[in-house]
Amino acid sequence: MKKKVSTLLFILAPAMIFGQHTFSIVAIDSITKEVGSAGATCGDALMWPGTPGAVLISDIIPGLGAIHTQSYWNEQNQDHAHEKLVEGYTAEEIINWLIYNDAEDNPSVRQYGAITLINESIKSSAFTGENCFDYKNHILGDNYAIQGNILLGQSILDSMESRFLNTPGSLSDKLMASLQGAKVIGADTRCYDDQVSSLSAFLRVANSDDSPNDLYIDIIVEATPDFIDPIDVIQEEFNNLNLSLEDYSIRNSEPQLLCIIDILGREVSNRKTGQLLFYVYDNGIVEKKIAK
């Protein structure tokens, strides 16, 4: 049986003080329409009992976009962001709505990053409240938004952007590289004494036909032992799943619809010729094919 990549990693670590979310990126692949979300923070599931750590901020709606609600995370704000994303608001419209309708009437402490896909048009937007903890900022590109607070400095965000833009391959490759760009001791300054960038992290990618609760790639590190960087744990899992698609190419300039039939003769999917077909089997074997 073929399955999507979904990994949840929880490694016991001692409880630590409460903190806020730190650096993250949301992005859309303009060709495949994949939606991606990745980030990390110097907080974990033990620090915030009952939560999955950094991934708390991430909301992906396959085929529509993603939004991160970070810095003084508020569940009601995130629920509203989700609703507006489903309703077809653009990234900027979602964030503007959140600013003017903050659940606690205090948008100055919030930070948001959003990316949307509406009628083939990708829009990105971000907001950094003036009362977020320094260093704080965000960067926007045509198909991505990068944001962070409690950072070592602007260099963390710049490195994330550079890695994202200059790494070849799939959206997941670029997001993984972007996280690595922030893997600096004390990237979240609260983690400097721990000699890591952060304590929990995530990397998520959705195909346009995925369910929001069943994403194509969903790697979550809720917590790690002392002195183990969660970005390294994600990288190891990413490598184990053989998700590097550096040789990806579209072989046909004019793709045609391809009907995929299972062994019983039932139509199970439609793909375009030239599209990469990527399968992960229960036994761990990875198979990559180009539809012809």
Predicted feature locations:
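Acidic surface patches and DE-rich sequence motifs
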Residues: D29, T116-N119, D262, N270, ...
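Short clusters of small/polar residues that mark proteolytic maturation junctions
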Residues: G39-A40, T128-G129, N270-K272, I290-A291
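Residue-level detector of functionally pivotal "anchor" positions at catalytic/ligand-binding pockets or at interdomain
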Residues: N242-V268
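Bacterial Sec-dependent N-terminal signal peptides
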Residues: M1-H21, L245
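Residue-level signal for well-ordered, solvent-exposed loop/turn and beta-edge residues enriched
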Residues: T32-E34, S121-K123, E246, R266, ...
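Short coil/loop residues immediately preceding or within conserved phosphate-binding loops
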Residues: T22, P255, G274
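N-terminal nucleophile
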Residues: Q20-N242
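C-terminal tail/sorting-segment detector
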Residues: L276-K292
